[in-house]
From Swiss-Prot:
SMART domains, sorted: ADF (SM00102), SH3 (SM00326)
UniProt keyword annotations, A-Z: Repeat, SH3 domain
A Pfam family annotated for this UniProt entry: SH3_1
Biased composition (Pro residues): 587-596, 602-611
Recorded coiled-coil stretches: none
Identification of the protein by name: Protein app1
The species this protein was found in: Schizosaccharomyces pombe (strain 972 / ATCC 24843)
Amino acid sequence: MSFQLDTSTHGAEIRNVYEKVLSGADDCSWAIFGYEKGQGNILKVVASGNDNDEFLDEFDENAVLFGFLRVKDVNTGLNKFVLVCWCGEAAARKGLFSIHMATVSNLLKGYHVQITGRESSDLNMDDIIRRVADASGSKYSVHTSNSTPQSKHNAFYDASQTFGSTAKVAPAPAPSTKTPLANISKPVVQAQKDSKDNSWDDSSKQSNTQTANTTSNLRVPVNASWSDAGRKEKSQENKPKPTPFGSGGPSKPTPFESHGPAKQISVQPSEHPKPSISTTTTGSSYRSAESSHAPTTPDHFKLTPLTKLEPQPPSGSPSKKPVSELEELHTAGNVNLSARRALFEKKESSTKNVENPVSHHLKSPVRTSFPPASTTASKQDSPSTVPVDKQETAKPINKQVSSNETSAQEEPRESVAALRARFAKANVSENNDPPTFPKTAAKISSFNSKAGTSFAKPRPFTNNPNPISAPEKPTSGESLSLNPPPAMPKVFPERDISSASQKAAQPSVITPSVPQPPAAPVVPEAPSVHQPPAAPVAPEVPSAPQRPAAPVVPEAPSVPQRPAVPVVPEALSVPQPPVAPVAPEVPSVPQPPVAPVVPEAPSVPQPPVAPVAPEVPSVPQRPAVPVVPEAPSVPQPPAAPVVPEVPSVPQRPAVPVVPEAPSVPQPPAAPVVPEVPSVPQPPAVPVVPEAGQLNEPVVPPLPPHDETQEPQVGGDVKATEHTQPTKTPAIVIYDYSPEEENEIELVENEQIQILEFVDDGWWLGENSKGQQGLFPSNYVEITGPNETANNPPAEPQAGGPGKSVKAIYDYQAQEDNELSFFEDEIIANVDCVDPNWWEGECHGHRGLFPSNYVEEI
């Protein structure tokens, strides 16, 4: 016997209801499946509907059911599906539940949550909705442009965007310099993703998403107006496109430095376009791409002062007060002024009176462990330029923070070599797309054009399977990309690989980057957590030397572990129970077929005999009753089927009146009784009816025609006692038509000769036509001297032939061969044919009567 669940018998109906729930039909939001009645392995649809309360009411504790429910996710507003597997406390055949549950789970695919219950407290609609919400994994809503973070940013930005005034906004405190660079968190500049006018490209949107999920240890006010870039696009149309600026490593926009007195650039409103510097080319101010990237020497630091390269403000400028380049960049909406003012002003004040800024920066011991640049520009620079920028940009943070009092208007200029080294280091992540800084890029481009240098434009970010491949070589006219890098974590592995390839070209200053590889293998997993957009923050690293690479590491492995946890228990729960509980129920199944096989079929004719038993006490049993079972052995006439009616003969209406009736046995004439049911009873008057009024009795079955058999008469008398060798005359009292070939026809009042008393119910005789055969003994009456042979009596208990008795009770004949009489009447010619039944004459009629109804005279 198979214990597998049958889903094909009602497969079409199951599929239709299941598809209705999946398709979101209004009239069907749930369906319940159960077993067909009487068939424990056939699955069918039990109920369906759209009321969730009715869904929970359908689960009965006496059944095993499977439910499929559609609910609305409160987080996303989408339709979610729930599979409910129910095994009631009082359900039968619980052992097959786990096997069938696995089959139903494969059949009803597409569910999000599976719930197993066994009592009503296990199923609650609020709990089901909560589980669906927890399983969705999204417990946030989409922010609009009017969100709270944007309002805070606007308030802060409005308070700090007045650049012409002398008021300064206090910068956020910088973290301690003891914090390792590897643990510096990413600044939260990307919190401006909810800006009203965010027309940046996809890279900025990607970076916004990353920063929203990144925790920052740097307490920097969120006031970088990334959205201002969109507003400035129209004003920048007349300006040349800024040179792209890519930064995957630590870099910062710094004021220009020179050996001469520093000129300050006055900030003009965006509606006054500035003259293009990067596009103004002269033969003496530019060098070829090949020469610009050739190895540099200390002679590069001896350049013409940058005062000659600075653009002059428009003649119509409303303010002549010089401002710093940092404020100008903030005007373009691309710099977090409040966060960086303290960092840059310290540098401006410290380098104001220094003749050689390079030698001054070389004294700083900080940031020696930061990985070197690995891009094309850094490879082609001289070894001296990389450490210069490396140490120049890595001043102690304490000094930078303490320089908040320094005026931003005093800005020394950097040398060309320092700028080139810093830009090359900023271009370390050529696969990233940093945000665009229009005015900063313009100044860098103009500076390069004057200094005769150019930088290669890094390739766009791609999922390069081979990060060891060398980057493209720069070409003349190309500029650094200014798109936001997609992922800061991607920068570290490339730096490590590229640093290994640059050991020959760059001296011991690059070696500090070797300790970084431990963080590399963990960070590549971060892109799956959507961290790529954090790269745009790279240019702001100088403001706070802390990096959040460490906190990101534990989050990456935790994300893939969540989906694996719920799957394991469900998979293990399916294969456990299929074998054990099924065994005890196997023997119970084959038993029912044994019950329907009715072995009592042959006993069907016995029920009629059963009622005779209780009624026997009421009427004396006839001696012929035991002879009835022998009739089937002889070829029976058509009346044989009537034999089962013999039990009804013993019933007598007068029996309840007679206390002695229970002890009366049946007379030997009982075989004749079967035909009585078809004949009405004679009148109660003791007057003997005429022969024409008597009804024909039922023919008893023929006894087996076997001469060797010794038939019994009266239950104890052998056939030899009543078998006569001579003919005995008899008269026919009823007409009889033969139904078998060995029978003869009898006509009423016809004289026949009895040849042999074969049985109490059948005799062998010869009619007036000379035909010999069997005939019913109760259809004739013996008239000759051998009259007693008709019913050979047993040993008479009282008297002999011609004896008379007196009736002591009224008796109504139940059969045609019985005698009716009233109390005190005399019955003559009594023959004691049986101890319980006697034969006598009364009112001109002869018949049988119970012996306990009379007394001897």
